[in-house]
Amino acid sequence: MALERTFSIIKPDAVAKNVIGAIYNRFESAGLRIVASKMLHLSKEQAEGFYAEHSERPFFGALVEFMTSGPVMVQVLEGENAVLKNREIMGATNPAEALAGTLRADYAASIDENACHGSDAPESAAREIAYFFSDEEICPRTR
Ligand code: RTP
Ligand code: MG
């Protein structure tokens, strides 16, 4: 299978828990490569734009407030089947339903503060990567 890219966020709760490295280790151990990465403190406008598809949902205000409550790490992950693989590493949206050993089972406190984001399809991955990274900021493997 060809290499695929996905977009990932380590959300403010997980950054506050000081588990950026632990989460990066999960990605790398699963064969995903970090090809772009940066720390950001999202503005309200950035968070609203990123989650625009949820703008009519009842949890939208709380989601934007949470996502702007502290710094996040945003990254591009590359590997075989990266979109699905990252979703498996993360576990279910609600940590109460997440399988043991997934990021959300281990690091998330609730469905509202659930440690990480991962694109849900290759199309959303492309859109989300472009939302946060220019082409020059992505450094694919050369050796
Ligand atoms: P994400 O986009 O953050 O990776 O999460 P996801 O695909 O697993 O879930 P999604 O349906 O896209 O929802 C985005 C985020 O909104 C919050 N949410 N809260 N209270 C609720 O019922 C509810 N549902 C979703 C979660 O923080 C979720 O990650
Ligand atoms: Mg989603």
UniProtKB/Swiss-Prot annotation:
Q: What does this protein do?
A: Major role in the synthesis of nucleoside triphosphates other than ATP. The ATP gamma phosphate is transferred to the NDP beta phosphate via a ping-pong mechanism, using a phosphorylated active-site intermediate.
State where the protein is found: Cytoplasm
* Organismal lineage: Bacteria, Pseudomonadati, Pseudomonadota, Gammaproteobacteria, Alteromonadales
- Which cofactors does it use? Mg(2+)
- What is this protein's name? Nucleoside diphosphate kinase
This protein's species is: Pseudoalteromonas atlantica (strain T6c / ATCC BAA-1087)
Keyword Magnesium among UniProt keywords: yes
Share an example GO biological-process annotation for this protein: CTP biosynthetic process
What family name appears in the similarity comment?
Answer: Belongs to the NDK family.
UniProt-listed InterPro entries: NDK-like_dom, NDK-like_dom_sf, Nucleoside_diP_kinase, Nucleoside_diP_kinase_AS
